Amino acid sequence: MEPITFTARKHLLSNEVSVDFGLQLVGSLPVHSLTTMPMLPWVVAEVRRLSRQSTRKEPVTKQVRLCVSPSGLRCEPEPGRSQQWDPLIYSSIFECKPQRVHKLIHNSHDPSYFACLIKEDAVHRQSICYVFKADDQTKVPEIISSIRQAGKIARQEELHCPSEFDDTFSKKFEVLFCGRVTVAHKKAPPALIDECIEKFNHVSGSRGSESPRPNPPHAAPTGSQEPVRRPMRKSFSQPGLRSLAFRKELQDGGLRSSGFFSSFEESDIENHLISGHNIVQPTDIEENRTMLFTIGQSEVYLISPDTKKIALEKNFKEISFCSQGIRHVDHFGFICRESSGGGGFHFVCYVFQCTNEALVDEIMMTLKQAFTVAAVQQTAKAPAQLCEGCPLQSLHKLCERIEGMNSSKTKLELQKHLTTLTNQEQATIFEEVQKLRPRNEQRENELIISFLRCLYEEKQKEHIHIGEMKQTSQMAAENIGSELPPSATRFRLDMLKNKAKRSLTESLESILSRGNKARGLQEHSISVDLDSSLSSTLSNTSKEPSVCEKEALPISESSFKLLGSSEDLSSDSESHLPEEPAPLSPQQAFRRRANTLSHFPIECQEPPQPARGSPGVSQRKLMRYHSVSTETPHERKDFESKANHLGDSGGTPVKTRRHSWRQQIFLRVATPQKACDSSSRYEDYSELGELPPRSPLEPVCEDGPFGPPPEEKKRTSRELRELWQKAILQQILLLRMEKENQKLQASENDLLNKRLKLDYEEITPCLKEVTTVWEKMLSTPGRSKIKFDMEKMHSAVGQGVPRHHRGEIWKFLAEQFHLKHQFPSKQQPKDVPYKELLKQLTSQQHAILIDLGRTFPTHPYFSAQLGAGQLSLYNILKAYSLLDQEVGYCQGLSFVAGILLLHMSEEEAFKMLKFLMFDMGLRKQYRPDMIILQIQMYQLSRLLHDYHRDLYNHLEEHEIGPSLYAAPWFLTMFASQFPLGFVARVFDMIFLQGTEVIFKVALSLLGSHKPLILQHENLETIVDFIKSTLPNLGLVQMEKTINQVFEMDIAKQLQAYEVEYHVLQEELIDSSPLSDNQRMDKLEKTNSSLRKQNLDLLEQLQVANGRIQSLEATIEKLLSSESKLKQAMLTLELERSALLQTVEELRRRSAEPSDREPECTQPEPTGD
């Protein structure tokens, strides 16, 4: 055998470290999942014995490699040094998650052996024990430690990373949150939802009268306007949750009584809708209340698309009731448990509205199925436990007794144990052992334990646990009455037979205790007839599985009323005191004492109102109310363990702290000034309020060893004022620092979010000069009213668009388009604010939610299931589906909106989507009839026919039409198949030139790849090449395609092809011989299509008229400027003529002195 190897390697797909160990697999053995640690050494011995027997027949050693990592534990054969690993030859022996290894044992007698017990099948209670041998026994502790560490890491990952938003197991619905109501019970009558809606409408109406506001969208007609015609809709409670029955008046329709609705809380939704401290608060009730109701595997999530956070998270265990409205069938709600501030809990009903009744039916059905599946899975995952009557329990105790004994003593214990079996079982075991002829006592003991294990495992399959028998008998007692089922009788006989094996005293005590329990059950059934107010509660507590819960739960209804009502405790005790019988039964007394174990009763020191009965009884009842009202169902198990640990206490609640006689002697010595009586001790301190429990072994020293402690010096008012000022200043400083931190965190998150959005490779790198040109255009003041030169913009777009400015440039190009086409479109949508659209419910929610996961699944911004990216995308698509009722939502829109969302904010992306759909005319191809898409496919075929005839003939030869490969190009604008950098460049050109860019890009792509397409000779390879290979373009090819698009001009051809399509369609209708009905249908379809075409032509005519009007206005401006220029020219000519006259006059004047110059006398020269 090769020496053990220890190598560490890292997986490529995860950051987990996998550790490999070279071992020898001794063997394996399937065992029961209830196998305990004392049994495991005998199982290992059996595996080794079986391995030795097989080795004699076929001496082959199994060299294996055990791979340990947090993601899985894998055992596979070791190929050896000479052979190479081949997964086809060497398949893994077993592979499981490390958390399924629930027992590991190291053989102390032979340290080179160790074994692991792996859960294989939780349903059939099967496990497999694998035994390994290591060549180096010092490595065995390291191997066991590695397996345990991997299991620990895997369990932590399961806790911290639950599959909360898994597409496979979660279903999402859009609902409108109406409000919440605190109720006093975990279940409700059928009319609860309708009553809640009426209360919501009443409150909203009263608020509307005080401050006028629009009516909420969830307002529905009240019950007086619509009679109750429908039967009760679907309502159910989660199976497996313990429930308490309602009072009779509530079941008879007393929902309007003040006892059920404890409080109405619609105004403080933003404070109480969230369960827990780590979840962000949702929006205010007057803001967006639409939520995504997500049903997972074991929980319900309420996600706010507005805040992008989880607003509510409830486990199925916390939900006790779900119901649909009777009159308001488009509403539903559920009741769940929420923790209160004082450590207790209360029940809250959440009410929601859907778009229609069918959606509510689907939600209720999904909830019911999810509850059922979760209950089944939890039952399967529940850890198996041994009861006192389990056959394997006796084997467990036997293995515990013989643990550490030598062979002879072990043999004696086994012989004693065999005497408890039947004669037939003893004879069978004796014969089987003698057949194998063991060589020594140790082998004989191993064989006996092996046969005993097989015997007890067979018995365990038919065994009924104590708790299961009690539940079965209680359910049968409800249906049959006082009759016991046959299974309970058989179980009782089995229990008596097992008890008879013990001492006579123990058996008698157990029989007497069982008789007392039976008498207690009879007292329960008798009390049903005596007290009608306790009937439903007592009948329901008989369904509880454990005795402590059965005795702790039955309380009067007034205690349930205390969960949410504001009534006085004393009034409840007075009103219900005469209904109870005067003598308290022992079971009730025990129940009262048990409740005080976990609740110290000194908190009720204020004297209540005087009751009619004795004050002692009323006080005890008051204490019991407080202890039950603050006890959650999850605390009952803790309470049972405390009760079992501490045992029964004294008569009154205050005697639960009574000490043993040794402790009392110790306390007398330690505190001689105090009496040992606990009641007097408590009376002395009754004025101090609630005291913490004192350790019974702690000495009480009131004044300390050196006298009374020194009193604290009282501070003056000035010192107190300075302390308050210092605390206030510190708090103000802390608040300012928190605000600054929040601002810094928000700015950092924005930068990270923007960087995450723009995580794609740029096609045309933008130079600094081009970036400067764009920044200059974008920073122009009043740019939305200034027309820029189209040639300059074409040149800038052709040279590249900076990625971080792309969203702003798209808005700039949209503004220039509006300035160029100053005419109102006929089909412009209503100017509804984006925030108002988000407050409504859409009927297209299912299609949108399905496509969210398909839209850019590999991009980090959209990859998170129901993350910020997907929720923002959902908001945009939902708002557009509400704005454009004709189109609604169509596949492909999610990619268009996703590209816009990557480059701008949510609201800006919605505005740009409206621009593309209405102003650019994209919405025509998304209409339900898809006629425009058919025309586009015809236009693309004609372009191929005219520009690439050989490629067109090749595609036609194999019957490949454009609809097989080009439909996604038009519906998603290449975003579903091509890289994001290329798609961004396509969007740049669409904002600049319009929708004809899609034809240019498609024609350029097919033309540039024409030689490669012509090489394929069948339909599958051609379509696969166009869909898969062609989108994986290189950067050079992409940039070449973009440059070709800027040089193409096919606008006139596209118009001609569209007219040609309509003419051919009319000719085809006229030439085909049809029957009258078919011709009628054809004519109707033609009529409808012609009407749509007429509308389109009217729209185009309106566009042309708008253009004509704009041109006429331009001509008028030019004429007016021409007249102004003519007047200016006349003025300049007059001015010129005047200037010429002035020049002539000056010339004439300058010529006159020259004529008189000879007549002038020259002065004589002067002498020196």
Swiss-Prot record:
PTM annotation (Phosphoserine): residues: 146, 235, 237, 503, 507, 525, 527, 565-566, 570-571, 585, 614, 627, 695, 941
SUPFAM superfamilies: PH domain-like, Ypt/Rab-GAP domain of gyp1p
A GO CC term assigned to this protein in UniProt: Golgi apparatus
Spans through the membrane: none
Described purpose of this protein according to its UniProt entry: May act as a GTPase-activating protein for Rab family protein(s). May play a role in the cell cycle and differentiation of various tissues. Involved in the trafficking and translocation of GLUT4-containing vesicles and insulin-stimulated glucose uptake into cells.
Record note on modification: Insulin-stimulated phosphorylation by AKT family kinases stimulates SLC2A4/GLUT4 translocation.
Presence of the UniProt keyword Magnesium in the record: no
Keywords: GTPase activation, Nucleus, Phosphoprotein
Chain intervals with Basic and acidic residues compositional bias: 632-645, 1145-1159
Lineage: Eukaryota, Metazoa, Chordata, Craniata, Vertebrata
Region (Disordered): 203-238, 532-551, 564-587, 628-658, 678-717, 1145-1168
Name of the protein: TBC1 domain family member 1
Residue stretches making up the PID domain: 246-404
Locations listed in the record: Nucleus
Entries under PANTHER family matching the protein: RAB GTPASE-ACTIVATING PROTEIN 1-LIKE (PTHR47219), TBC1 DOMAIN FAMILY MEMBER 1 ISOFORM X1 (PTHR47219:SF18)
Superkingdom of the source species: Eukaryota
Residues in Rab-GAP TBC domain copies: 800-994
Compositionally biased spans, kind Low complexity: 532-542
CDD domains hit by this protein: PTB, PTB_TBC1D1_like
Self-association state and partner proteins as the record states: Interacts with APPL2 (via BAR domain); interaction is dependent of TBC1D1 phosphorylation at Ser-235; interaction diminishes the phosphorylation of TBC1D1 at Thr-596, resulting in inhibition of SLC2A4/GLUT4 translocation and glucose uptake.
